[in-house]
Structures are given as C-alpha cells and as structure tokens.
C-alpha cells in the first residue's frame, strides 16, 4: 500500500429534496460550511478568546464619587436610588437644566481588540425638548445612543475635522438592523419604560466598526452598524481613550418636568487579555534627598499628574520606593531609619512646581518640591519600611485600579503623591529618598 502525502481532489455527492449533485473538493475549492449564531471580530476571526473586563460598576451602596464625576446645572440632580441600586438623573422644567455623569478615567484600549460597552439603563417615553445620551464619548469624540425627544439615533462624533466637530447621526428609520419597532425580524417593540441592556461594540484603528445592540432575554438584537472603513478620509474619532458618559438635558424648557434617566450597572469588556503594557516612565527625588524636619509627620516626596495637554492619557502607576538616612552629628555615621509611607490621591499639596517629564512623548508631569500634603485626599496604599529594609520597593497590585483620572468633567488631572514619615520620635532632620514608576499606554 502506497501513501501520497499530496492533497487529492475528492468528489462528494449530496442530495436536496430529491435532487443530487457532485462537488469536487480540493484545497483551492474547499467544502463550504456555515456556522449559525457565531460572532466574528472586525477582522473576521471567530470570537473564541477569553474576554477581559476592563471596567465595571454596580452602584450597590452609593453614587461612587471616586469613580464618576458629575456636573449639574439649572436645578438638575444626580442621586443614588437604593430601590434600583442605581443612579437617578433628573432635570427640571427649565431650559438648560442638565446633568452629566462621566467616568474619571478614560477607558483603556488596545488596537486589534474589539471591546463591548454595556449599559443597564431605563429611559422614559420620548418627550420633545428632552435629550438623553449615553456611550463612550467626551462631548467632542466618541459614540453614543441618543433619545432626542422625538426619535432614537446611533451617533458618532469626531473633533478632528477641519470645520469643527463632525457628527454622523443615524435615526431609527435609517438603522440597518432590527429597529425593535415590532416590524423587525424579532417582532419586539423596545419599551422606553423598561430596564434595558444596551451594548455598543467598537473597534478603532480609525476605520473600525461601531455596532449597537439590545440584549433582551438572552438574545442579542443588532439595531445598527456604522461602517467607517473605505469611506472616511479621517479617523471616525480622534482617540479611542475616552470616558463612559451619560447626559440628560432639557433643551427647550419643557414645562412638564422633572424628567429622568436611570443609570444602572456598566461594564467594558475587551476580546482577549489586553495586559497593562506600555511605555515605562520614572521619576525620583534628587540624590541629595529631601529633609523631613519633624518625626511622625508626613511629608510629600514625589507627586505626578497628567499634563494639561494629555488629559486623555492612560497612566498606570506600578511601583514606588522609599528610604531614609539619619546622621545625629557630623562625627557620626548615617544610619538607616524606619519610615511610614502613604500613596495619596489628590492630596492638598502645598507649594512646589509641576515639571514636564524629560521625555517629550510622556503624558505626565512631576512635582518634587511641595512641602505639605494637608488633610484632604484619599489614601490608596500605606505601610511601613523598617530600618534594614529601607529602599525596598513596593509593587502595586496589578488588579487594583490606580489609573490617574480627571475631574471637572475631564479638565483637571488627579494627582498621585508618595508621602513618608519618620517613625522614631527622637529623630529630626532625617533625609528621605524616593522614586515612582508608571506605565503610559500609547
């Protein structure tokens, strides 16, 4: 018996409703197969990878001011409603009454990895003059689902156009999927008074797809897909590093208020593991160190923040180090002493100058000349560095969120400060040293 390793054509017979046919199958002409209910990425790959959750929140116990920034005007409010484990957003009957909710962090994105942003939301029946929006956007770039008071729409916006912000808005009559008006393949009519799961799948590269889905009773109903490839002369939005955002506004002064938008859980899931890869940056104190005048008092060693020109940058602190020496008199040798440390978000820093990192590509500024930390701020990490272990580095938990965010709806960077204190009450004038390392995703 001989064996021929080269592929050979084969003929396959099949019948359909009494008829028969012969198909010759080769490597060049394979047998066609079709898979039902299988999703693929924008590159045509089957979605078989393990997804990674980049962001989620649940509002079990409050409005989560450490994660979400809120701006209200003309009597609008945002409040925690324990009966729905969510946030009620409310505007008054006055024109211009508005509430905006936006994550302090922009969302991480890795090119080549489609991502899905999910909202649990409850709208209300559309009311002329009342506008609701939610999606991944910052007012200048991104995408969102909109109820403008008269119609629903899927929208992308781009600030990189020569004539200002470019808007592509597709109303319900223009959707290329199931319009969920009772006349689509599902026969479903989406209720604005019911809690809904609305998902937006996107891929950037400047020319990716943006898909809008409703998830109802375990089934995905695609309502519209925006195709940007081979069509636009510019990226569909300037950056994929954008915040999750919801808006509610009384645009015309509808007098029958208040009007509501109810925000539930959110999640952002990426296909495959993105890992926290990026460009490393590091800053340290001067080699002469920094004097700690009084024992058991915290002093700032180093602080970092986003550049005012890079507020959508993704900065992930990873590692810091501290050490201290004390010399009781010029005739004595310096000794290593024990320290307490704290890593503080938005300390009330006194004095100092913010300086751009030497790398012109960096997203960050540093400050090593501040003199006090005040009493404000949130301690993200704390601990002790004992004598002989002085200089030991502290690696931050990779699964904990330390990303530097923004407030003022994206206009003011958070700060991250490494502060230390001498533990020994008999030590004054010790000299401390420190360094911080972080990753910038570009």
Annotate each language-model stretch with its function.
Residues 1-71, 77, 271-332, 420-421:
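Extended, low-complexity segments enriched in Ser/Thr/Gly and acidic residues that occur primarily
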Residues 34-117, 121-124, 205:
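Flexible, glycine/threonine- and acidic-rich loop/arm segments that mediate assembly and lattice contacts
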Residues 90-166, 305-308, 325-326, 331, ...:
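Secretory/extracellular carbohydrate-interaction modules
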Residues 109-123, 267, 271-424, 433-441:
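Beta-rich globular "head" domains
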Residues 116-122, 131, 144-146, 197-203, ...:
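Residues within well-ordered beta-strands of beta-sheet-rich folds
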Residues 127-150, 217-222, 283, 421-442:
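C-terminal interaction-tip segments
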Residues 131-195, 375-387, 391-395:
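Glycine-aromatic-enriched beta-strand/loop faces of beta-sandwich-type recognition domains
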Residues 143-145, 190-194, 199-285:
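Aromatic sugar-binding interfaces of carbohydrate-active proteins
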